[in-house]
């Protein structure tokens, strides 16, 4: 078993993800939203690249069975039902519903990983459940950090490190690339997540938009035991 890390969506290529188990992380906030929604009984989530595509696909559904969710530049999209706050995706809102979703970074990363053997959705809130599944798969793994506007994101990187760290506790002979080793070392040195992520640029953006409650939620460790999986069409509970 070998683990590699891709530092942003801009660095995803078919040869890197092909036939690998791909783990997509957009901790602030898309994969935290997806994990929360699936945990709260959402039937499926369908990710789209553009707002226009999302709105067009919504026409195929009855209004009472579909929810539009997402953001651009961390702000709710006009005409959508929900923003990209995981706190909005409560059981009473999403249970048995289909969520059509588009975000700046997360859904872009997902749609670039379609050649992966499996595509797993991970966040800080379900990291240990993801690590457990990855050990069960026993395949080569690529952890894809969605990043922020194509750039490296500290928050996604430490989340990947947490997953790697959890796996190493159960299986010490995992082969790690240098960038995967560094991700693990970053987590080992910064287990108090907030003191690390507060240095991240995206953290500052979220603070400026008064999204402190989202930050507090997204940095919680392994509070959800659900692992969402993307089959290239929809995201469901594994």
UniProtKB/Swiss-Prot annotation:
Q: Identify which cofactors the protein needs according to its UniProt entry.
A: Mg(2+)
Q: Supply the EC number(s).
A: 3.1.3.71
Write down the SUPFAM superfamilies for this protein, in alphabetical order. ComB-like (SSF142823)
Q: Which UniProt keywords apply?
A: Hydrolase, Magnesium
Reaction catalyzed: (2R)-O-phospho-3-sulfolactate + H2O = (2R)-3-sulfolactate + phosphate
InterPro entries found in the cross-reference section: ComB-like (IPR005238), ComB-like_sf (IPR036702)
Q: Its domain of life? A: Bacteria
From the Swiss-Prot or TrEMBL record, what is one GO molecular function term?
2-phosphosulfolactate phosphatase activity
Which Pfam family, giving just one, matches this sequence? Answer: 2-ph_phosp
What family is reported? Belongs to the ComB family.
What name does this protein carry?
Probable 2-phosphosulfolactate phosphatase
């Amino acid at each position: 078993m070998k683990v590699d890390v891709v530092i942003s969506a801009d660095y995803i290529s078919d040869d890197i993800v092909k036939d690998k188990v791909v783990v997509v992380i957009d901790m602030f906030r898309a994969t935290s939203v997806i994990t929360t929604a699936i945990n709260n009984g959402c039937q499926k989530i369908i990710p789209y690249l553009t707002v226009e595509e999302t709105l067009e696909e919504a026409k195929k559904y009855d209004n009472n069975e579909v929810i539009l969710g997402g953001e651009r530049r961390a702000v709710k999209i006009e005409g959508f039902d929900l923003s990209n706050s995981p706190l909005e995706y409560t059981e009473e809102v999403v249970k048995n519903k289909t969520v059509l979703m588009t975000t700046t970074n997360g859904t872009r990363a997902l749609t670039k990983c379609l050649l992966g053997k499996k595509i797993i959705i991970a966040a800080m809130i379900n990291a240990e459940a993801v690590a457990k599944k990855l050990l069960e798969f026993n395949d080569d793994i690529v952890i894809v950090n969605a990043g922020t506007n194509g750039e490296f994101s500290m928050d996604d990187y430490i989340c990947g490190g947490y997953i790697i760290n959890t796996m190493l506790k159960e299986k010490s002979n995992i082969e790690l690339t240098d960038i995967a080793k560094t991700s693990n070392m970053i987590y080992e040195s910064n287990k108090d997540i907030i003191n690390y992520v507060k240095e991240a640029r995206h953290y500052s953006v979220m603070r400026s938009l008064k999204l402190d409650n989202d930050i507090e939620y997204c940095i919680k460790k392994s509070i959800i035991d659900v692992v969402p999986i993307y089959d290239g069409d929809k995201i469901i509970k594994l």
